[in-house]
């Protein structure tokens, strides 16, 4: 199980760089134990992968996979948090399940990447409802600037472009 947990970037804590800010994730063990249980029960790999995105009752903890990524501090701008979490979900999905890195596609089309910028944001649109950032910060409220999936110019929420619908990238179709 340890190797799979490494692939999906599992961590028992928030991963903050300073010791005082590195907080344990109270329910992270549920995902870890579900991975170990599924592997010990020889769950076929196609089912194991499917349970990460659409878990059944017995394997519902495997659905936590998509929420295991980075967590920015509570006082961080919710717009930054929203798009960093979406990027983390897409990046982890690409590396863990497809063996492909999508790093460049967030900001620009790249000649050797299999995904265009628009296709990248279509993939983030698939995870859009999974990211529920509360627009708050210490002593003030910061509104969410973007409330629907969009292509972002140079990967920044400050430069929204056209809206996108959920979709996958053409190279695998």
What is the predicted role of each segment?
Residues 1-153, 159, 163-173:
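Short, structured secondary-structure elements
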């Amino acid at each position: 199980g340890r190797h799979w947990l490494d692939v999906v970037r599992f961590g028992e804590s928030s991963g903050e760089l300073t010791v005082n800010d590195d907080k344990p994730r109270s329910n992270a063990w549920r995902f870890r134990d579900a991975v170990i249980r599924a592997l010990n029960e020889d769950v076929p790999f196609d089912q194991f992968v499917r349970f990460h995105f659409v878990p059944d009752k017995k394997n519902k903890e495997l659905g936590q996979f998509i929420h295991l990524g980075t967590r920015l501090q509570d006082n961080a701008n919710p717009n930054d948090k929203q798009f960093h979490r979406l990027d983390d979900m897409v990046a982890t999905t690409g590396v863990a399940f497809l063996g492909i890195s999508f790093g460049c596609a967030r900001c620009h089309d790249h000649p050797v990447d299999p995904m265009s910028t628009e296709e990248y944001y279509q993939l983030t649109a698939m995870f859009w409802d999974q990211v529920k950032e509360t627009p708050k910060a210490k002593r003030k409220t910061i509104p969410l600037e973007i409330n629907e999936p969009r292509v972002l110019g140079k990967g920044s929420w400050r430069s929204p472009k056209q809206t996108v619908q959920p979709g996958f990238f053409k190279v695998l179709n």
